[in-house]
């Protein structure tokens, strides 16, 4: 009798796909998908509650009944004016900026397989801030719809410089190399922006709070002008979950599974540039939101980017609004800028990650 031949060993990509889809190509259990979808609903509910707190709390607290009256039947009173012209635009800006930074951080960490990837740590926000500073200090541009293009250019330039420096040499673009390159690039860009502002005291007075990261004094016009860029970046980024899942297996495995590797990388870079440029143009450079939130999300939902990306986009504005409200409450009648509060919250998380050595590539 002829002996049976040993089956051909499966490739790592096939094993990964089989593990993800089940033994016979079946999709993951519906129960887990339903639970994750329910978690998204919970996150959305938390965001609504935090948005209500952001509108009601501040230098002077306003009852929710007054907030509802201001929304449904404004009468021109001081409380209604503050709510409609200051707090609602500020809250909407916090939601947009938080979603943009959270999604940008998740995209960067997935694409580079670098757990330290963050728009602030990799110098992307500082590049966008330098672009805005150039627009204001040298060209006198004050329209957000105009200087946002300078923010996009600065963010793209920072991305190219950081990746070029971090990937130089035989070892390639490792997490630590990229982080060091990003920190160095961010410091150079920050120094350049500071030098420009020192040359123009009037511009410095206008931008000194913005440079620390602030949601104060947004206008409805600013939101309208920047919202299309944020919306485009959010829509594009959320569509990249499946190809990024495939790329997490490696470029060769991704190609074998039908992923257009170059196109996915380019689209991810475009999404990150749109998100970071618009967020920085609106609120200044903010640190740690894009670093801490994706890590917390992956601890809950796992590594599937189809869930990591939307969860990050919902959880990050919750953190940002919480930091903003806290900054307003602890320094009444003034406030502590949200950039300072985010750093105060995010820095301990970063230190804890480093001490536990959770810095392996994703």
Question: Where are these predicted regions, by residue range?
Answer:
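Alpha-helical transmembrane segments in inner-membrane proteins
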Residues: 1-362
């Amino acid at each position: 009798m002829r002996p049976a031949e040993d089956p051909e060993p499966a490739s790592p990509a096939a094993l990964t796909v089989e593990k993800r889809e089940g033994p016979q190509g079946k999709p993951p259990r519906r129960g887990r998908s339903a639970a994750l979808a329910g978690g998204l609903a919970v996150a959305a509910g938390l965001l609504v509650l935090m948005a209500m707190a952001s509108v009601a709390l501040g230098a002077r607290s306003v009852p929710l009944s007054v907030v509802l009256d201001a929304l449904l039947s404004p009468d021109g009173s001081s409380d209604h004016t503050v709510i409609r012209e200051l707090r609602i635009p500020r809250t909407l800006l916090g939601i947009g900026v938080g979603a943009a930074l959270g999604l940008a951080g998740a995209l960067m960490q997935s694409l580079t397989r670098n757990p330290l990837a963050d728009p602030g740590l990799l110098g992307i926000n500082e590049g966008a801030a330098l672009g805005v500073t150039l627009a204001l200090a040298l060209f006198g541009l004050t329209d957000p719809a105009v200087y946002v293009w300078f923010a996009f250019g600065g963010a793209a330039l920072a991305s190219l410089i950081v990746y070029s420096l971090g990937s130089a040499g035989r070892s390639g673009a490792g997490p630590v190399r990229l982080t060091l390159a990003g920190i160095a690039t961010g410091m150079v860009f920050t120094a350049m922006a500071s030098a420009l502002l020192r040359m123009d005291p009037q511009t410095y007075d206008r931008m000194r709070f913005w440079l620390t990261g602030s949601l104060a004094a947004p206008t409805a016009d600013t939101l309208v002008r920047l919202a299309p860029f944020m919306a485009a970046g959010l829509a594009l980024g959320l569509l990249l979950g499946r190809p990024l899942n495939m790329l997490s297996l490696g470029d060769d495995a991704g190609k074998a599974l039908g992923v257009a590797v170059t196109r996915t990388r380019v689209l991810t870079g475009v999404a990150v540039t749109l998100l970071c440029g618009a967020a920085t143009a609106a609120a200044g450079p903010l640190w740690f939101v894009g670093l801490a939130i994706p890590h917390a999300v992956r601890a809950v939902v796992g590594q599937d980017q189809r869930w990591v990306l939307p969860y990050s986009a919902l959880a990050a504005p919750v953190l940002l609004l919480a930091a903003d409200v806290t900054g307003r409450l602890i320094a009444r009648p003034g406030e502590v800028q949200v950039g300072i509060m985010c750093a105060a919250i995010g820095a301990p998380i970063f230190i804890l990650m480093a001490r536990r050595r959770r810095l392996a590539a994703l």
